[in-house]
């Protein structure tokens, strides 16, 4: 059956700032306390979406979350009106404010893990929300992510959205950022590659930085998504590269159809894994980048592998890269050799995503890939699909509500909270989402 990969990109939120919250993510740590530009960040993301949509790649949008997230501050013992809660946090424990104001939901590669209908036992598209247990600021995302996905994939005959796994370290799950799908045409059954960093009883694990994904979580997600057991491979990421800043597999590998583009040191027992994929995926092609040409350090600093590998109708592929790749002579030299070599990659497309990159999120972090048949595409909430009208409406919305300068101190401003809620109220109507945010359901307005 014919099917297409639709990229659902996260829209950057109004509180996008640099707080260095993500230990193990070198860019996040390095840019801590810098001044951010939320308006520019949102527009950089929107331009990527629109450019790819105009080039014929189906594209949709996932909205930001409510931030600062007052309900969690109340859980932590701060009481009073919303303004009083903010004021008490600033006075008593200001470190919490940045965590509950993070715009990290924009990196929707961590929103969920997807199983297309061609791979599932019941013939539905399955989406399992990620619990993001390893980082407090990200663990807050799951309930609203679930509400958003249910509002977008709202036809229960075709889509099953599963709640996140229990919030414990044993079941740490980071979503599609640790998941690849390999195969022929999108509509054919594919091989799902789940990548984990640690498992109980296995001493092979990183020592410097945390392994955020467990094998136990990956196995549970595969079960929830009803993936045919014959179409699953579990592989461990190389713990040495996690210790060098590769906190998700999509920082060291990316797949599309029959191609796996990865670093030579991406996986534990890599030659064994690639042999297994060759045996099980027709026409499988591994493009392994040697460490002698691109070091792990350079891969992390440029986000070479946090790229999007997109298929054209003629079978050729386009590699979508951040500008940092073009600015690194060694990486750009390698990429031009790649273009000239015998493989499906025939074009490089570069985007300026500096605002997201400075927090450790490249092109692949910003998108959730969902393979859909024509019938399934028609069943998706049409208001989220990118086109000229939506692009212009979202650009105007960003101009109206987003600040062009934000520091950590600004997060305490009650006006920022009010601006954010008003903006999300308008956006949820624009995207026909219903009341997906807690502040809408509580009926508390902006007070």
UniProtKB/Swiss-Prot annotation:
Which GO biological process entries does UniProt record here?
arginine catabolic process to glutamate; arginine catabolic process to succinate
* EC number(s) on file: 3.5.3.23
Q: Is Magnesium one of the keywords?
A: no
- Note whether Zinc-finger occurs among the keywords: no
Q: Which GO terms describe its molecular function?
A: N-succinylarginine dihydrolase activity
Catalytic residues? 174, 248, 365 (nucleophile)
Q: In which pathway does it act?
A: Amino-acid degradation; L-arginine degradation via AST pathway; L-glutamate and succinate from L-arginine: step 2/5
Quaternary arrangement and interactors, per the entry? Homodimer.
According to UniProt, the name of this protein is N-succinylarginine dihydrolase
Tell me which species this is from: Escherichia coli O157:H7
Gene, per the UniProt record: astB
């Amino acid at each position: 059956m014919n099917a297409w990969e639709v990229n659902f990109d996260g829209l950057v939120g109004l509180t996008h700032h640099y707080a260095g919250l993500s230990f193990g993510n070198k860019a996040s740590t390095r840019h801590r306390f810098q001044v951010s530009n939320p308006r520019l960040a949102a527009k950089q993301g929107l331009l990527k979406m629109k450019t790819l949509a105009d080039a014929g790649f189906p594209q949709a949008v996932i909205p930001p979350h409510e931030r600062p997230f007052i309900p969690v501050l109340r859980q932590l013992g701060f009481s009073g009106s919303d303004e009083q809660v903010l004021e008490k946090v600033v006075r008593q424990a200001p470190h919490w404010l940045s965590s509950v104001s993070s715009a990290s939901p924009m990196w929707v590669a961590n929103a969920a893990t997807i199983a297309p209908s061609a791979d599932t036992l019941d013939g539905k598209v399955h989406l399992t929300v990620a619990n993001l247990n390893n980082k407090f600021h990200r663990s807050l995302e799951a309930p609203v992510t679930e509400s958003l996905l249910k509002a977008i994939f709202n036809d229960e005959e075709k889509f099953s959205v599963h709640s996140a796994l229990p919030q414990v370290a044993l079941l740490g799950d980071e979503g599609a950022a640790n998941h690849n799908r390999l195969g022929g045409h999108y509509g054919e059954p594919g091989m799902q590659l789940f990548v984990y960093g640690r498992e109980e009883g296995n001493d092979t694990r990183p020592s410097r930085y945390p392994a955020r994904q467990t094998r136990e979580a990956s196995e549970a997600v595969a079960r929830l998504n009803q993936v045919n057991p014959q179409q699953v491979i579990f592989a461990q990421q190389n713990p040495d590269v996690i210790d060098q800043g590769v906190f998700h597999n999509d920082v060291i590998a990316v797949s599309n159809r029959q191609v796996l583009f990865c670093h030579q040191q991406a996986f534990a027992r890599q030659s064994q894994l690639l042999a297994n994929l060759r045996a099980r995926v027709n026409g499988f092609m591994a493009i392994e980048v040697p460490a002698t040409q691109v070091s792990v350090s350079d891969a992390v600093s440029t986000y070479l592998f946090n790229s999007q590998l997109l298929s054209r109708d003629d079978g050729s592929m386009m590699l979508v890269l951040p500008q940092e790749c073009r600015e690194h002579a060694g990486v750009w030299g390698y990429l031009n050799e790649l273009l000239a070599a015998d493989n499906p990659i025939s074009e490089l497309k570069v985007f300026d995503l500096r605002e997201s990159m400075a927090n450790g999120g490249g092109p692949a972090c910003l998108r959730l890939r969902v393979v859909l048949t024509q019938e399934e595409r028609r069943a998706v909430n049409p208001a989220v699909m990118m086109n000229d009208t939506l692009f212009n409406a979202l650009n105007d919305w960003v101009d109206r509500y987003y600040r062009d300068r934000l520091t950590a101190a600004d997060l305490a401003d009650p006006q920022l909270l009010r601006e954010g809620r008003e903006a999300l109220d308008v956006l949820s109507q624009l995207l026909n989402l219903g009341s997906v945010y807690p502040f809408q359901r509580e009926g508390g307005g902006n007070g």
